[in-house]
Amino acid sequence: GTPDAGGTWSGPSAVIGGLIDPATMSAGVYTYTAAGTTPCPGETATVTVTINAPPFPGTDGSITLCSTDAAVDLFAQLGGTPDAGGTWSGPSSVVGGMIDPATMSAGVYTYTAAGTAPCPDETATITVTINTPPDPGTDGTITLCSTDAAASLFAQLGGTPDAGGTWSGPSAVVG
């Protein structure tokens, strides 16, 4: 409608200029009173104000896992006290909020906490890094004559061992 200007507001918080500031004012019933002109009495109308809090998805985080580690709860990696019941998205499908480094991909996983209108959804991310365990190769053997030239121990390992490891044994190994 078209209420008469110049009325007064009353309610749970002081109204200045007919404006409600959800950051500083309380929710509740606000009453607008339009003054009457004799012999007509003043009339009132009300506005019920609901103020929804925005969702809190937590704060961004990161985790580094080994591909042989057990599954980890992504929700526990969010900072703060995030709202429960949100949804996960990322490079792999997240089931039950868990990431299994043996079967899922590294990357950025997004947690979305649903907002209650008119508050929008909010998101936080977890950056997941998945490292592979070192590969020392498989056991090997070598038989040498004491007059043979030096031989590479690394070449005696089976499989595809990672370079750059360290050696230990009954004698110092150089190189």
How would you label these PLM feature ranges?
Residues 1-175:
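Proline- and Ser/Thr-rich low-complexity, intrinsically disordered segments
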